[in-house]
Amino acid sequence: MAKKSMIAREVKRKKLVKKYSAKRKALLDEFNAAKDPMERLEIHRKIQGLPRNSAPNRVRNRCWATGKPRGVYRDFGLCRNQLRQRAHNGELPGVVKSSW
């Protein structure tokens, strides 16, 4: 189980990403459309002025059951250990043990 503070930090990051996504997208579109280097520099400074944790690449996928940050399957949102355990218990519909 991950520390509660780490899980809370990720929740906070997700909220910040959602809050600033429109503003960040508008600034990035403006940045890509600008031709003048000085104008681009000005827009870049505005982007840098946004909170660091509002960037979507800082959000880490975590297991919703344990909060573990590694070995998380996107389809289920579970880490590999929980996926195996829940699949064996029949808690994941459509998941069957492979045999050939």
Curated annotation (Swiss-Prot):
Keywords: Ribonucleoprotein, Ribosomal protein, RNA-binding, rRNA-binding. Transmembrane segments: none annotated. The keyword Ribosomal protein applies. The keyword rRNA-binding applies. GO terms for cellular component: cytoplasm; small ribosomal subunit. One of its GO terms (molecular function) is structural constituent of ribosome. It comes from the Bacteria. NCBIfam families: PRK08881.1. Binds 16S rRNA, required for the assembly of 30S particles and may also be responsible for determining the conformation of the 16S rRNA at the A site. Belongs to the universal ribosomal protein uS14 family. This is Small ribosomal subunit protein uS14. The gene is rpsN.
